[in-house]
């Protein structure tokens, strides 16, 4: 199970939001490249980057910061936030992004996910952000009637690399991940699931590892994203990575 540090970009800075509220943000750094380098040096094998301005604008906004992160690290980078078209995907891949996350558009226009997977095989993940089990879109500002698990199952034959599942009620709260909901997602669909939201300490990583599978359907929880906990010093990234590696072995 990969331990993936998160860099959320707002106005070119690294921030963390509380429950996805753009007005409740803490600025941690004005140097995204240096922040990415720091996490990579602690052993991260992948970087999770979100363009928060992009999520609301409907197109990526923080291109300079994304380029700075790419220049600073050699590990793969996955990026989400405001990706709505195949043209935008191509631009991001040209910038050096390795994997792209389709969020709101996956709920609004599922067919685009299939086309994207066909055009960029192995490089497309779907971000499913849920509030009480229902999919939220447009930077979490709107909750739909779509069931999160049903949306994941819709893409089983698309060639989606991973589902990034976020429980909005936990995000940025340090109250622990929603292990049960993440496990349900992985047990119900056949696409590997990355857990996101609420991680606060090593015990949370342990709980996810203990529930990571593989399940009878062959699927598993393949990773966990951590943000606020590593920025606040509550979780030692290197220790979390070491724990995961010991578990895998």
Swiss-Prot record:
The protein's annotated pathway: Amino-acid biosynthesis; L-histidine biosynthesis; L-histidine from 5-phospho-alpha-D-ribose 1-diphosphate: step 4/9
GO molecular function, one term: 1-(5-phosphoribosyl)-5-[(5-phosphoribosylamino)methylideneamino]imidazole-4-carboxamide isomerase activity
Catalytic activity: 1-(5-phospho-beta-D-ribosyl)-5-[(5-phospho-beta-D-ribosylamino)methylideneamino]imidazole-4-carboxamide = 5-[(5-phospho-1-deoxy-D-ribulos-1-ylimino)methylamino]-1-(5-phospho-beta-D-ribosyl)imidazole-4-carboxamide
Location of the protein in the cell: Cytoplasm
Broad enzyme group: isomerase
Coiled coil: none
Swiss-Prot/TrEMBL keywords: Amino-acid biosynthesis, Cytoplasm, Histidine biosynthesis, Isomerase
InterPro entries membership: Aldolase_TIM, His_biosynth, HisA_bact_arch, Isoase_HisA-like, Isoase_HisA-like_bact, RibuloseP-bd_barrel
Active site residues of this protein: 8 (proton acceptor), 129 (proton donor)
GO BP field: L-histidine biosynthetic process; L-tryptophan biosynthetic process
Gene Ontology cellular component terms for the protein in this record: cytoplasm
EC number(s) given by UniProt: 5.3.1.16
Family annotation (HAMAP family): HisA
Family as reported in the entry's similarity comment: Belongs to the HisA/HisF family.
Protein name: 1-(5-phosphoribosyl)-5-[(5-phosphoribosylamino)methylideneamino] imidazole-4-carboxamide isomerase
Gene name of the record: hisA
